[in-house]
Amino acid sequence: QFVTKVVSCRAAELRPEGGGEALSGFQVVLEDTILFPEGGGQPDDRGLIGDVPVLRVTRRGPDAVHFVQQPLQPGAEVLLSLDWNRRFDHMQQHSGQHLITAIAEQMFGFKTTSWELGRQRSVIELDTPSMSTEQVEALERRVNEKIRERVPVTVRELPADDPAIETVRSRGLPGDHVGPVRVVDIEGLDSNMCCGTHVSNLSDLQAIKLLGTEKGKKNKTNLVFLAGNRVLKSIEQSHSTEKALTSLLKNGPGEHVEAVKRLQSSVKLLQKNNLTLLRDVAVLIARDFKSQPDHRQLFVLHR
């Protein structure tokens, strides 16, 4: 939580993610904020201003703009609360991306051209047309080794004209950026210009799971990953599915695939036999109709 003051409040509309009818509300600027505005591939934070939910946080120049649906009085002192679960999830995914990016370039020379922190999974776009299964497995082993080594993650701010900035990984600053440049360091591995939120030690990531690759745009490869609590959640969901299949198929997890293949073969055979029987029935009905002495030109059969 954080105490601050309202600087301005003006009427505005918010377009919901995924489309839909615009929401009427207010854009609020505070003296300072603990809520992160979306940027750098990372979604925004959520929280409360007093008891008013913050539905979106965006950046306008140096200011964070909070969208709410109730007006707030400029000059009023307010208590700002952060949705920590959402923030920590984003910290794990974002620091995980920095780690994967650094190791992928170190091991294979694959540079990261963009990334996306999704609701269910995150994707890193690598500047390579393909990535072998062996490379994915080696990369996963290496990033998890670094997590177990408890490597510190630190943040420093440099003046915009500091020569040290030239040695930092960067995809450039926004055109309206003012003030010092923020750099996130993974000790001995990476220095990256970044505005996002991060863990203070790689051990906070717990684990990283690389889910595989997908074909990207313009001869690039998308590497899909989970970090931290998302790995545990994925394991929990997989275990629940495994338990349900064990109950339905009446066999152990190691036999699920073969059991499903047998069921698919049985269904195909049943469908084939059913079609054959339907054709036989149709032939018999047609013969019966033709054998009737007073049959008409039009015959209708409904079942």
Language-model segment annotations:
Residues V68-Q70, L126-S130, F225-A227, R303:
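Short beta-strand-to-loop capping motifs
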Residues L14, G19-I34, G75-F88, D176-S191:
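Short, hydrophobic/aliphatic alpha-helical segments
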Residues Q1-A76:
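Conserved nucleotide-binding/hydrolysis modules and their immediate coupling elements
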Residues T33-I49, Q73-I124:
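Active/ligand-binding-proximal structured segments within catalytic/core domains
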Residues R86, Q106-N219:
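Functional cores that coordinate and move charged inorganic groups
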Residues L205, L211-R303:
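Terminal appendage regions of diverse proteins
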Residues P37-G41, H90-S95, S130-E137, M193, ...:
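Ordered, soluble secondary-structure elements with a strong preference for glycine-centered loop motifs
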Residues A64-Q70, H94, H98, S191, ...:
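Histidine-centered active-site/metal-ligand motif
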